[in-house]
Structures are given as C-alpha cells and as structure tokens.
Amino acid sequence: MAKMLKLWRLVLLAAFSLLLMAARMPDMKVVPWQQVEVPTQNILLDIAFTGTNPSHGWLVGDKATLLESQDGGLHWQVRKLTALEPEAYLSSISFAGAEGWVVGQPRILLHTLNEGSDWTSIRLSKQLPGEPILIQALGPGAAEMVTNVGAIYRTEDGGQTWHAQVEEPIGAIKNIARGPGGEYLAVSSRGSFYFLYTPESRSWKPYPRESSRRIQNMGFGPNGSAWKLNQGAEIAFTSDFTSGEWSKPLRPGRALSFGYLNAAYQNDHDLWVVGGGGTLIHSPDGGKTWEEAKKLSNIPANFYSIEFFGPDRGFILGQRGTLLRYVGYSNSPS
C-alpha cells in the first residue's frame, strides 16, 4: 500500500511538473527588436511620421517631451516649444501629409502645416468636456479629437471650429482606440465597462466586463476583429467588435506575470503584446500559440505602447525614455 501511494505521488508530481512547463511560454530564439537611444528619461506616449516624408518622425510624452527624427526613428533630437509648460502631458500625435496635430493636458492643441518646422498653439474652449487625449489627422484642415470623458469633436477648418460627433460623453476613461472606419473602443476608468462608438450612431454603447478581472485596454484587429486585455495578464478576442461577444479569456505564459498594457497586430496573424517589467510576447497565429522575448525583461521599464506603420516598421514606447524599433529577424543580433 505504501509503495502504491508513493507511486501515485510520483505520478502526480510528474503531471504537475508538466503543467508548469506547459504554462511557461517558450523563449524567442530571435528577438526582432532593438533598443534606440533617445535624449530623454521621460515617458514616451505616442509616435507618428509625416505623410510626405516617411523618414520624418515625431515622439511625444510627459513633461513637454517632443522629439524629432529625420532618419526613420534611428536618431532623435529634442524640440523645445515655448508655448508648452514644463509639466505638459503630450498624449497623442498624428499626421496627414505635412499637416500634423498634437494634443495633451492641460487643454493642449498644437498644429503644424509644414511637418513640424513650425508649431502653432490653438486655444481650446474652457467649455470643452474633459481633457484631450487622442487626435487623428483626417486630411487638409481636418482632424478628430477625443477627450478623457469620451467627448468627440471634429474640425474641417484647421482647428478654428470644432463640432461634436457624440450626443453625450460617457465619463472618465483610461484608454481609447480608434478603428479604421472612425469607430472607437473606450475603457472606463475603473475597467468595469467598455464602450463602443460608431459614426452612424453618434452615441456610446456600454458593455459590462465578462471576466472577473477588470479591463485594462482594448484595440482593433484585422477584418473587423478586436482584442481586449484584462488585469492579471488576460487576453480575449472577438471576430466582430460590434457584437459584444468575446472568447473566453486566456492567460499566456506563467500564472504569475506582469500585466499586459497594450497590443498591436503586425499583419493579419502576427500579434504583439507589451506590458510591465519589459514584457513583450508574440503570437504568430492570432493568439493560438505564444512566445516571449525574455531578454527584454532586463530593460528596467514598463512598455506602454506598441504601434506598427506597416508590417516591417514598428515601435515600442515606454517609461524612462524607452524606445524599441522593429528590425526584423534577419537584422536582429540575437
């Protein structure tokens, strides 16, 4: 009897060990990302390149951070604007052609017509609900701006007048993403709800969280799909972002890990997710299997944002002036 119990203990121990091994994501053999030195230790929040010169890029961040690159993001220089207070929080930048926009707090709106050679500060009304957090350039003189309470405004005259696109704001939000057709997914400040806006509805539709864990961030994927990151390193997917129906949340990798903060599709199937403690994971098949860039966990920074400007051009932004550039597998030294 004692021998039988000992045998069962060994079997259970082996099974438990296999479960632990399965829970660990494999390490990426080649990490196609390289860190770029930037002349700041501030948090980097958004990146954009001009529509007239794809090598001419801009970075924005907290503490009035404004950086410029002329070589596609390899090297960056500080740009100082006297119109900005030292503690200005620049959260979003967007270009359409040579025309660009920057928004931030407190009530910051910057505008350029010449790729950023000159920036003009545009005064925003004190009646504006909330603070600007997102800007999208749409064409000559046209842009769409969103505030941190879900108010959406559009201009067609270079920012002189703005017209409301939504009937009522939704209250404090912590993250928002814009879809290719002008749709928005917004996460409530507490992560208990998310909201969907479509241009034809002119209103926000609320959806409660389906998981016991609060929602951290959301974004759009290819062909009408979307992803959702929950606290506790959970990921869920939907093939139709208008349906309100999501897959069962999964937790790639270890049971204990840093939280996931943002995600981006490189193409229709390659998905990258970033998070705290230098976390970067990759799925080559839309979320079925995963691998981890463990070597990047040595970078002492949280990764807040990831964005691709085409399948071969991507950037990761984070705290302490952290910037990574996608270099591809053939150019990676790892």
Curated annotation (Swiss-Prot):
Residues forming coiled coils: none
Keywords: Photosynthesis, Photosystem II, Signal, Thylakoid
Pfam families in the cross-refs: PSII_BNR (PF14870)
Subcellular location: Cellular thylakoid lumen
Position of the signal peptide: 1-22
One GO cellular component term: plasma membrane-derived thylakoid lumen
GO biological process terms, semicolon-separated: photosynthesis
Gene3D superfamilies: YVTN repeat-like/Quinoprotein amine dehydrogenase
Function, in words: A factor required for optimal assembly of photosystem II (PSII), acting in the early stages of PSII assembly. Also plays a role in replacement of photodamaged D1 (psbA). Assists YidC in synthesis of chlorophyll-binding proteins.
Domain-level remarks: A 7-bladed beta-propeller torus, about 55 by 55 Angstroms, with a depth of about 25 Angstroms and a central pore.
UniProt subunit comment: Part of early PSII assembly complexes which includes D1 (psbA) and PsbI; not found in mature PSII. Binds to the lumenal side of PSII complexes. Interacts with YidC.
Stated family: Belongs to the Ycf48 family.
The name this protein goes by in its record: Photosystem II assembly protein Ycf48
UniProt source species: Synechococcus sp. (strain JA-3-3Ab) (Cyanobacteria bacterium Yellowstone A-Prime)
Gene name tied to this protein: ycf48
